[in-house]
């Protein structure tokens, strides 16, 4: 879990828009972020395997 201060800091609008960065909606992680889903790779994997994300199916061939 990310520090609460960093999560709050990322939610504020920065002085310069170049400084803005994404964080996971669930855990607040900043790295490994999937823009399309708004989740980090860990939360994405957990929710995809649980079937919480519609349209995502585990690949098998």
From Swiss-Prot:
Example GO BP: translation
Domain of life according to the entry: Bacteria
Cofactor(s) needed by this chain: Zn(2+)
Binding-site residues for Zn(2+), renumbered to this chain: 24, 27, 40, 43
GO molecular function: rRNA binding; structural constituent of ribosome; zinc ion binding
Any Pfam family: Ribosomal_S14
Keyword Ribosomal protein: yes
Assembly and interaction partners: Part of the 30S ribosomal subunit. Contacts proteins S3 and S10.
Family that this chain belongs to: Belongs to the universal ribosomal protein uS14 family. Zinc-binding uS14 subfamily.
Protein name: Small ribosomal subunit protein uS14
Organism whose genome encodes this protein: Acidithiobacillus ferrooxidans (strain ATCC 23270 / DSM 14882 / CIP 104768 / NCIMB 8455)
